[in-house]
Amino acid sequence: MAMNYNAKDEVDGGPPCPPGGTAKTRRPDNTAFKQQRLPAWQPILTAGTVLPTFFIIGLIFIPIGIGIFVTSNNIREIEIDYTGTDPSSPCNKCLSPNVTPCVCTINFTLEQSFEGNVFMYYGLSNFYQNHRRYVKSRDDGQLNGDPSALLNPSKECEPYRRNEDKPIAPCGAIANSMFNDTLELFQVGNASDLTPIPLKKKGIAWWTDKNVKFRNPPGTDPLEERFKGTTKPVNWVKPVYMLDSDEDNNGFINEDFIVWMRTAALPTFRKLYRLIERKNDLHPTLPAGRYYLNITYNYPVHSFDGRKRMILSTISWMGGKNPFLGIAYITIGSISFLLGVVLLVINHKYRNSSNTADITI
């Protein structure tokens, strides 16, 4: 049965109540919350409150920015591009697919000594690790040592889930594209003799990743037996249980592998490769002078117009070299201070005009 609509009924709270019934109404309860009568506080912006705020922000941000900028500039850093696209580059020969394995050497000079611990990174450009399908192409259960996931990886790993009718360990596009160049550093002596620089490969991964997120399959058997029934990723030269002779750095807990599996947010990124620890407080870790970078060139980047580089860097209390943060603080502080000055002049000018007008009237 149709019902007649009456706007007056809605305004009054509904149709008339039948005799003996209870009135129905849509009117909100008469409370402070539902009737929007809650007490409110609204600041009144005056010159006396706004101007000091601008000046305080400027006086705080500018010194902080200068301190961060100076600290960043004191960090020693050098980048060596070894992509090899330049015909004069020693690594240009490695772009040919017929030269395998390819070893090239780049010599460079440190103009200043590197003090303290030195961090060696590898850097890649135009590599989009943040692609949605790429980021999801992994099986965290398998990487955590789950035996069922080891033999039956997640479908997210497709098309790198199975190969030769065997499950791939580790599966997925991230693991399949793992960086596999080998970098070695040598110091050139006075008689042109080469002194190898010790590169530490443990301690480069996050503690939580090494001890919680990544684990080998459980058991007391040799690692090869625990990975029995699986096969290596398509692009790998050797299986995961042969990544290192050190049992504490082999399999899924290999730190080079763990570092690579932490995907980057931007297409140009760097990842920690090795540590160069300081052993003697009387001598710099890397003295100024000539060095050789020996590269076993395996990782192809030419197909996607990428670039490869090696970075040597020290760190400070704020991390690695990052001048942007200091510049940002200085810029914001300067703009705030300048706005304070401009508003102070405007306030002074028009306040005097207002007072004069009042007197004239």
UniProtKB/Swiss-Prot annotation:
Positions glycosylated per UniProt: 180, 190, 294
Region annotated Interaction with ATP8A2, chain positions: 49-348
UniProt keywords, alphabetically: Acetylation, Cell membrane, Cell projection, Cytoplasmic vesicle, Disulfide bond, Glycoprotein, Golgi apparatus, Lipid transport, Membrane, Transmembrane, Transmembrane helix, Transport
Modified residues (N-acetylalanine): 2
PTM remark: N-glycosylated; contributes to ATP8A2:TMEM30A flippase complex assembly but not to functional activity.
Pfam families named in the record: CDC50
Predominant location category: membrane
Tissue-specific expression: Expressed in photoreceptor cells; detected in retina outer segment and other retinal layers (at protein level).
Disulfide bonds: 91-104, 94-102, 157-171
Outcome reported for the amino acid change (mutating residue 192 to A): Reduces ATP8A2 protein abundance. No effect on interaction with ATP8A2 or ATPase activity
Segments traversing the membrane: 50-70, 326-346
Stretches the record annotates as Required for ATPase and aminophospholipid flippase activity: 2-48
One CC-aspect GO term: photoreceptor inner segment
Subcellular location(s) of the protein: Membrane; Golgi apparatus; Cytoplasmic vesicle, Secretory vesicle membrane; Apical cell membrane
Region Disordered: start-end pairs: 1-28
Effect of residue 296 to A: Reduces ATP8A2 protein abundance. No effect on interaction with ATP8A2 or ATPase activity
UniProt membrane topology term: Multi-pass membrane protein
BP term (GO), one: phospholipid translocation
Domain of life: Eukaryota
InterPro entries: CDC50/LEM3_fam
Exoplasmic loop side: 71-325
Domain notes: The N-terminal domain seems to play a role in the reaction cycle of the catalytic subunit such as ATP8A2.
Similarity comment: Belongs to the CDC50/LEM3 family.
Subunit structure, interactors included: Component of various P4-ATPase flippase complexes which consists of a catalytic alpha subunit and an accessory beta subunit. Interacts with ATP8A1 to form a flippase complex; this complex forms an intermediate phosphoenzyme. Interacts with ATP8A2 to form a flippase complex. ATP8B1:TMEM30A and ATP8B2:TMEM30A flippase complexes have been shown to form intermediate phosphoenzymes in vitro. Interacts with alpha subunits ATP8A1, ATP8B1, ATP8B2, ATP8B4, ATP10A, ATP10B, ATP10D, ATP11A, ATP11B and ATP11C.
UniProt function note: Accessory component of a P4-ATPase flippase complex which catalyzes the hydrolysis of ATP coupled to the transport of aminophospholipids from the outer to the inner leaflet of various membranes and ensures the maintenance of asymmetric distribution of phospholipids. Phospholipid translocation also seems to be implicated in vesicle formation and in uptake of lipid signaling molecules. The beta subunit may assist in binding of the phospholipid substrate. Required for the proper folding, assembly and ER to Golgi exit of the ATP8A2:TMEM30A flippase complex.
Name of the protein in its database record: Cell cycle control protein 50A
Species annotation: Bos taurus
